[in-house]
């Protein structure tokens, strides 16, 4: 829209095949995602459900759009479409590029999708806002995990670019770098906020241009904006295995050594309230119903022998 008048912008986009839309100022993004769709109904629900939950971002001459799966869309099924990242010319609305958040054959990261799960698994997308780095022609993209949130036995592998931070060249859509904050995510630990750009004054290194990703886990993952190298060392720590049939989790997860976590990591009996002995007893009784543990405590089967509820 023209920001002064609110009228559709002349010369931007074009006619879309839906009655009532103006002949200019509109871009049909569904056409650029590459899936069959009906102009009025969208992508068939048996294929998937796609939407946009955050505003587009303008980086120099490029508009970048992070698409996402509809929140809560049929989490009982494994099929969905991926929320690939789209880019358009900011003046004309002309399509520039698409970045596949689930790599296709021959693309970097395709080998992290075993069982040919890349063909029908979806949900990997960017529902959180993107971050612009106009000086370096970079857009930083935070992503969420694949279908389904708490089980991934049908999609063995690390599942790039799920639950990652991706730096894309805004002119070409090429991946500059990426970092996967959770491998084979079955905890719904999607990156929930726009990456933060900051300049860090580090003793012995001077001013370092950085980008930081705040996470649901209470960690902040901090990287060199240009290279993606962690500012401080990451530790690949061993995590528990899953007892759910068919599930094969990653044996390790990357943990930042700095900064320290800003939130508690998992839960144990020591974390329960003890204002009075009665409250303590009641809290323990409630906790006994749940399978609680460390940060990467695996989800459990609903029909587990202990009769507990996954936390």
Q: Residue spans of the language-model regions?
A:
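Beta-sheet-rich non-transmembrane sensory/scaffold domains
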Residues: 1-311
